[in-house]
Amino acid sequence: MQNSSVLSFLRERAGLQPDDEAFSFTDYEQDWAGVRKTLTWAQLYQRTLNVAHELRRHGSIRDRAVILAPQGLDYIIAFLGAMQAGFIAVPLSVPQAGSHDERVGAVLADTSPSVVLTTSAVADAIAKYVDHSDTDTVPAILEVDSPNLDVENKSNIRLTDAPSTAYLQYTSGSTRLPAGVMVTHRNLMVNFQQLMADYFAPTNGVAPLDLTIVSWLPFYHDMGLVLGVVAPILGGWRSELTSPISFLQRPARWIQAMATSSHPFSAGPNFAFELAARRTSDADIAGLDLGACQGIISGSERIHPATLNRFSDRFARINFRDDMMLPSYGLAEGTVYAASRPKGSSPEVVYFEPAKLSEGTVKRCEARTGAPLLSYGTPKSPIVRIVDSDTCIECPTGRVGEIWLHGDNVAEGYWHKPEETQRTFGGKLANPSPGTPEGPWLRTGDLGFISEDELFIVGRMKDLLIVYGRNHYPEDIESTVQEITGGRVAAISVPVDETEKLVTIIEVKKRGDSDAEAMQKLVAVKNNITAAISKSHGLNVADLVLVPPGSIPTTTSGKVRRTACVEQYRRQQFSRLDG
């Protein structure tokens, strides 16, 4: 695999198994029952070459090609075509019609693309959007589904001086403006080997030949791109894909797609498991069987053990087992994957004393008397160390510190951000332990610890709440509240009379036959939350803000933007349900 890439694997598959189905996409916007479209390996490779030829007419090797297209097979062709042309692909989401997408605008200005790849369905809207963007030059707009890109082209594309960077994965920007992570072709190959070695450890890193990737995750997100596009090519597997909207409209589609696929392997963030468990009816799953499922990765956001339990319990009747659940840790700066418990072992939840965690130390306690945290197993590759971020000295076992990563899956850095690249990707250990490299290390910004040789994660350094001089992790408080409300929560600290106080923003549905009854239920919810936070965390809440679903600002991957929550709270911009 030394000189291999996603493109060389695609070419090989098109030659060896040209007529085998590679990618399928089910479109539920055309028809509620779904319209399924497919591509064989030969079709995919030919269309990729055609897009690459067209791109060469509009730019040069190392130019950027931004992808602004709806989720679908054309998005995959655009992504692969950009890399095939020697361009650096930049996967993004389509801006909402009639609005200015701050993130997309910032990325266009940052990358100065030669070409924007889109589809005929949204080309006019994209052209207008790009015309008003702050770019040095106006990029060409290329429709990937144009008829003339579907003809056979006999000539080859020669990449004599191709860039090492395959694509720019723009971060979701939960704590800052988005930055383009420079993911290389080698990063992809190495990270794929790492995740295979861990997820399929019982079979020596080898998956069943008829494994099917099932995914609705957006292609512009790291997990959606690697799982939905890259992994099927590298593994030679078939894929069953759809859009995030299709999943949100009807979560049962995800379960049904897995149950009707051979040896399905899938992934989703925590909220997806919650939605599927709550909004899938008995009729939806009648006659289905998940017994052949190879695993479902849970990642991208804080994983709540109670959610995984609800999912496992809900679908146990169709032979889903809790050892099929794969809680995983990763980040775009490490391509996508960093650590997970191996397939075949049930998720392990360990309880820790909250007071000790607040002090930065670790002490296990009896079940359900402390803060529940998921184990992410014993990290092997990449190398993981817990480090004191101030002294750059490794923390002893049982001490909370910053998670640092070292390995060939770690990206090159941030696009056109040398200082931030050095700060994040250039970590060096002081007095490293035997066998531990001095550097360079990726400083993840995540807080975690090692207990009994296993990795646990407590939250983001920048999100740490300091209330009355003590550290508290917002995810722990949010988890406590979610057990009561089931909706999205943001725990933030705000200055009140020169002291940091705890405020929680909570999404709930207003229920009741009358306004008086609805208000009575909201008061009961607030009382239950106040008592739970006091009991579990020893904290008084300065303000409980109950808001309608969809009020809390999030990133494109669904993570809560706590900094934005603080700003909205200070400006009194939340619409309170209780007046």
UniProtKB/Swiss-Prot annotation:
Membrane-spanning parts: none
GO cellular component: plasma membrane
Pfam family, any one: AMP-dom_DIP2-like
A Gene Ontology BP annotation from the UniProt entry: fatty acid biosynthetic process
InterPro entries cross-referenced by the UniProt entry: AMP-bd_C, AMP-bd_C_sf, AMP-dep_synth/lig_dom, ANL_N_sf, FAAL/FAAC, FAAL_FadD21
Key word DNA damage present: no
Protein EC: 6.2.1.-
Keywords from the named record: Fatty acid metabolism, Ligase, Lipid metabolism
KW Repressor (keyword) present: no
GO molecular function term, any single one: ligase activity
Domain of life: Bacteria
Record-stated family: Belongs to the ATP-dependent AMP-binding enzyme family.
NCBIfam families per the UniProt record, alphabetical: FAAL_FadD21, PRK05850.1
PANTHER family reported in the protein's UniProt record: DISCO-INTERACTING PROTEIN 2 (PTHR22754:SF32), DISCO-INTERACTING PROTEIN 2 DIP2 -RELATED (PTHR22754)
Protein name, per record: Putative fatty-acid--CoA ligase fadD21
Organism: Mycobacterium leprae (strain TN)
Gene that encodes the chain: fadD21
